[in-house]
């Protein structure tokens, strides 16, 4: 902001002299800038408050400013103010308001307030300061002062390629002469006296300013100091809307939009005018004309304006303005509607073009389908013609298979969508019945397997297979097996003898991967099992020469858990046959041994404890131990059952019926001056009769250690007058040897257990990757020595069945289901392991 107001006189003019005089009366400038927050304020100092106008001002206390007041120069000559008349502020305001239009003002017509002020140099201004304004001093002697100093700047510049009299830079593009300064004529602002560019500037930067742009900028700056920047009269401004703007606007005038249904019948009372008016919809208000009231004066009809903007009302025609505005709105609406209609038609053309392309594709597809269906129909009609009895070239099963393969390969979509069941029933079934008419399954079990396998790939419905369905009306292959193949099997099973099981087992093994699972289940449950059950009821273990396991066990891979109901009557009949059995009869072991791995461990142990162990205990109790004449038959009869009965049961028999008598005989022998070498051989001979598994049992080990202790006590005592030479040493050596063998055996067992644990740890580390539930069950089965394998050709609701020991299970979403009596029961993994053991 300019500080020229500080130099104004009482009426706002700038005083020409340099006298620091300030008037205290209120001027027009003070009134106009009363509410101007940006005006320069002078804060009164303490000295001014004390002394008033007589206060002296130091140069240090002056306020900083842009142009600033200079300190009074007492050395300058005295300047006098020329007398004259000046106009008042009111007359100047009248002259400003009298201008109707803005006229170009030349720079010479500027008010004196905005012109440059001449410097009051006075007589003492040093003339030497004027010399540098020209700035034309030669540059050749640049840096000549270094001749009288120790500076090396000139030398460094010359080493870097500087040539005196030329510009700096690689290409000497720098300026040679210093930047010239130009003295402004007066004290005005920058640009007040025209261009201030020097000759050097014009040469270095030859840019010519446009006079029109300069004039426009000048007029713009000129209008800023007027009281009314817009002028007393404004030219009317017109706003034009292009069609593109209306399209971008994209809406219809609110006055012309259709009213909403819920607001179309609303009663509205208008009290904005002189009289109260009633409208029956908001749309009527929108169509109300801006007609002035007749009785009101013209001044009251105009909107109130405040301040200086309130002007006299002009010529107004509300009806005409309304009609013109209505025409404008209708035109805009028509333009927008036409644009929308055009866009809609273009979109419709694009949509119809896409529809045409789609319909063309559909038409081509339908033509291909019609062509393919025609070819398929020709092939079917050819098959039907060759199926007639009087045809000279009858259709064979191999040719029919080739026709179906062609349909499946070349016309898969039509073949998949067609009714394969009806087609196969009409063409394939008669040929298949003719093919199997002379077939005997027990003599030629593999007859027709290749043909049926080929037709399985042609007719089986994969979707029903994945869902585990057995709908005969939807699967042609299942219906073929059930209606054509199954009657031959039923017929042969009714004539089959269960004791001759090998031909039937071979037949089913050959077809188990071909026939559907539910048909195999039907054969095993409804045809085979009843025959076996009836034969088991008629079996007598005392009279039948053929062992029962020879015609029951071959069915285990196919039937597995289905044979569980037969085990109970078999055990009952075997128990009845063993009532009068003696351990000397080895035939019982031959009959029972094949059933050890078939029965569950619990049922087998219970059967042994009930029927075999008492007989063995009675036989062992009849054993007579005589070192001089020993009969070992009874002992051998008992020891032969070691693999059949558990180790704990055998050790119990030895503790109860053998070791008491054996230790008693040893004590009696030692008390009669024995030969210790014979006792040693006798001891080692009996110990060799037992297996390592029995000797490792703690009870058996304790009994033999007790015998060694008895022998050591007998040797160490002084009983008897005669002592065999070396007997004590021999017995001590024997004791040491036997104890060392026990320690070695225990160490070997511990080492084996450690190796097993290490291998198990390696397996766990290797299997640390994420596994599924089936892999976890398999790992647990390996740890507990339980057989875990899938059942071939067996599924339940599409899930694969597995055998876990003697239990049939299946896995569904991480849950194990065990086959119960009637339903499948979910169980935990630990319970499954316990049941399998």
Swiss-Prot record:
GO terms for cellular component: catalytic step 2 spliceosome; chromosome, telomeric region; cytoplasm; extracellular matrix; nuclear speck; nucleolus; spliceosomal complex; U2-type post-mRNA release spliceosomal complex. Residues 1-50 are annotated as: Required for interaction with DHX15. Its main location: cytoplasm. Residues 1-21, 53-72, 85-133, 179-236 are annotated as: Disordered. One of its GO terms (biological process) is negative regulation of protein-containing complex assembly. Residues 1-13, 53-64, 103-116, 217-231 have a biased composition (Basic and acidic residues). A motif (Nuclear localization signal) lies at residues 700-705. The modification Phosphoserine is found at residues 2, 59, 98, 144, 210. It is found in: Cytoplasm; Nucleus. Involved in pre-mRNA splicing, specifically in spliceosome disassembly during late-stage splicing events. Intron turnover seems to proceed through reactions in two lariat-intron associated complexes termed Intron Large (IL) and Intron Small (IS). In cooperation with DHX15 seems to mediate the transition of the U2, U5 and U6 snRNP-containing IL complex to the snRNP-free IS complex leading to efficient debranching and turnover of excised introns. May play a role in the differentiation of ameloblasts and odontoblasts or in the forming of the enamel extracellular matrix. Belongs to the TFP11/STIP family. This is Tuftelin-interacting protein 11. The gene is TFIP11.
